[in-house]
């Protein structure tokens, strides 16, 4: 079975709120949010701006990343967004070989 590459993303609403989510297709999910579908907390909060995205690898890893980011304070999330890809190790989120676009080592 082929597994999809999962991504962590953060969206900023017009009021400045940061929303954290996961998906296998960031652009499709952003479009869905923009149309009012998806998360109820984003409905009517546009325009929405994608401020962070990173491949995480498998669904299990991205769920852990999402949980960790959702536990951050607003100030910490702002710092996370400011650091972009450098934020991952800073906040204890390790990149897998798969997420970095490399093939996993053969067993």
From Swiss-Prot:
InterPro entries: GIY-YIG_endonuc (IPR000305), GIY-YIG_endonuc_sf (IPR035901), UPF0213_domain (IPR050190), UPF0213_GIY-YIG_endonuc (IPR022992). SUPFAM superfamilies: GIY-YIG endonuclease. Signal peptide: none annotated. Residues 4-79 form the GIY-YIG domain. It comes from the Bacteria. PANTHER family: UPF0213 PROTEIN YHBQ (PTHR34477:SF1). Belongs to the UPF0213 family. This is UPF0213 protein SG0387. It comes from Sodalis glossinidius (strain morsitans).
